[in-house]
Design a protein with these regions (language model features):
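Structural and coupling elements of P-loop NTPases
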Residues: 1-528
């Protein structure tokens, strides 16, 4: 395997509390990166989950910013070079959508975690839409099988209906809740017996599904039911083919319990075998292939203050082609100048280590002293722009004001850094000059206030503003655009990039504007 074929870069996504951070931790446990997994919610346990590292995340037991972790993994019994696995653990809380959407632009595949009792929830649907838009292959892990949940066939039906994708089980549960005996791994033809243990790995037995040994191991009734259900699975669901998975037509499904380490290794083993290595990336100018000799990459996330003792920013760069080498000058397309990086890093959540080189699929942290914005492209001299880092029209809006006139410099800097990170969107109203923050969820307002106070020593206050929708506008005819902006002056704003934004205060105002000015294009994402 060459360096590109070894790489597996993926995101783990789910609705809040479906067990995503726990699954991430178990992957790290199998990858030998951590010795003990942090029990996520339990405050009695000293260890806080490894992948949640911002203060506010530790307080609440939820992930609010994407963490990047990498480890080497070689499935048992396989020889040769290990796979290099890059995991992007995304926010699960329903308010943290922007960051998650953007993360999905930097991965080659995704694992969706579904709670066996709750099934598909609203956020999972939204994230699946983004995967579909980008043709990202997904594997589904149905979690919490050791608790009472719904019938597996019901959950599979719901997955197909709600996520609009065909599914194919590659493992099957034997009982559930108190009667949960284990799973039969259809992909490997193995029986995995369940012993509730958060640290230890499962007992595996090679068993022919028709043999009497199966009855001895799980009981006659359960064995008969398993045979019947597996027959049904083979009859109802398409035969598994790697091609249909990679082209995002079929989603393989695994069952297990992440908290008890159960079904996780089977998922990881199968994942590294079938998941795609880095795929070509679409730039505005052309398609960029990973095997091209020249380096290219894009910034999909900026994080301030990984270390609160240093006011540092780190820009996360996804490598698309060629080879990244430390200290070599690279062309920053937007700034039209060369930049070099003496201390690029790779991550294990907060622990970072300096690297000398990186390959397509890798995520590299570049020290950022204000030169990067989300979506920036780095190359070896070619002028190109990677597409697909959208901002979605926010759902909630508030005026933001500086609450301490003595700290206006800190307030300004903090707000600018947080907006560059993509925590929320900032619009400046052209009519009254006031700043409006737009977010996808209420919790983001709290995060902004908390981080301004704790990281920048600045205070803000929120004031209500009644807005229905923010849309980016453009027109082929410059005169038409200027006329619209004049006529609708009180509704006009600029975003952080200086683009024109129309802030409609009601659905009526928006639909009338669309009717009266048919030459104006209204966009609900900033990528057009």
């Amino acid at each position: 395997m060459n360096e590109i074929e070894r790489r597996r870069t993926f995101a783990i996504i789910s609705h809040p509390d479906a067990g995503k951070t726990t699954l991430t931790e178990k992957f790290l446990l199998f990858g030998g990166q951590i010795q003990v997994a942090g029990a996520v919610k339990n405050n009695k346990i000293r260890k806080t989950a490894t992948s949640d590292w911002m203060d506010i995340e530790k307080q609440r037991g939820i992930s609010v910013s994407t963490s990047v972790m990498e480890f080497d993994y070689l499935p048992a019994g396989q020889e040769g070079a290990p796979y290099k696995v890059n995991i992007l653990d995304t926010p699960g809380h329903q308010d943290f959508c922007e960051d998650t959407y953007r993360t999905l632009t930097a991965v080659d595949s995704a694992i969706i975690v579904v709670d066996s009792a709750k099934g598909v929830e609203a956020q999972t649907r939204k994230l699946m839409e983004v995967c579909r838009m980008r043709n990202t292959p997904v594997i589904i892990f149905i979690n919490k099988m050791d608790r009472e949940g719904r019938d597996p066939f019901d959950v599979l039906d719901e997955l197909e209906e709600e996520l609009k994708i065909k599914v194919r089980p590659l493992s099957w549960p034997i009982g559930q809740g108190a009667r949960f005996k284990g799973v039969y791994n259809i992909y490997e033809h193995q029986l995995n017996l369940f012993t509730p243990n958060k640290q230890r790995v499962t007992e595996k037995v090679e068993v022919d599904i028709q043999s009497s040994e199966l009855d001895e191991r799980v009981g006659e009734r359960e064995a008969a039911q398993l045979r019947e259900e597996l027959e049904l699975v083979d009859g109802v669901y398409p035969k598994f083919e790697e091609e249909t998975y990679r082209s995002a037509e079929v989603a393989p499904v695994f069952f297990g319990s992440a908290l008890n380490n159960f079904g996780v290794q089977e998922l990881l083993d199968c994942f590294v075998h079938i998941a795609p290595s880095p795929r070509p990336t679409q730039a505005e100018e052309r398609l960029v292939k990973p095997e091209e000799p020249k380096f290219s990459g894009f910034i999909f996330k900026i994080t301030a203050n990984i270390d609160p003792n240093h006011r540092s920013c780190i820009a996360f760069c996804k490598i698309c082609s060629g080879k990244f080498v430390r200290n070599q000058p690279y062309y920053h397309v937007r700034l039209d100048k060369n930049v070099r990086f003496s201390s690029p890093t790779q991550f294990m959540a907060q622990r970072k280590s300096t690297i000398d080189e990186a390959y397509p699929g890798d995520i590299v942290g570049l020290p950022d002293n204000g030169i990067f914005k989300i979506g920036d492209t780095l190359t070896e001299g070619e002028k190109m722009h990677f597409r697909g880092l959208p901002s979605f029209s926010p759902l909630l809006f508030k005026y933001i004001e500086n609450d301490d006139p003595m700290k206006s410099k800190q307030f300004q800097k903090g707000l600018e850094q947080l907006m560059n990170e993509g925590v929320a969107q900032l619009f400046v109203n052209q009519f009254n000059g006031r700043r409006i923050v737009g977010t996808v969820g209420q919790l983001q307002f709290e995060v902004i206030q908390y981080r301004l106070e704790n990281e920048y020593n600045a205070k803000c206050r929120w004031e209500p503003v009644h807005l229905h929708k923010a849309c980016w506008i453009e027109a082929d005819d410059e005169k038409e655009l200027e006329n619209f902006k004049k006529r609708k002056y009180q509704y006009m704003a600029k975003d952080i990039e200086g683009r024109d934004v129309f802030l409609a205060d009601s659905g009526y105002v928006l639909s009338m504007a669309q009717q009266d000015f048919e030459h104006i294009k209204f966009h609900f994402t900033s990528e057009f």
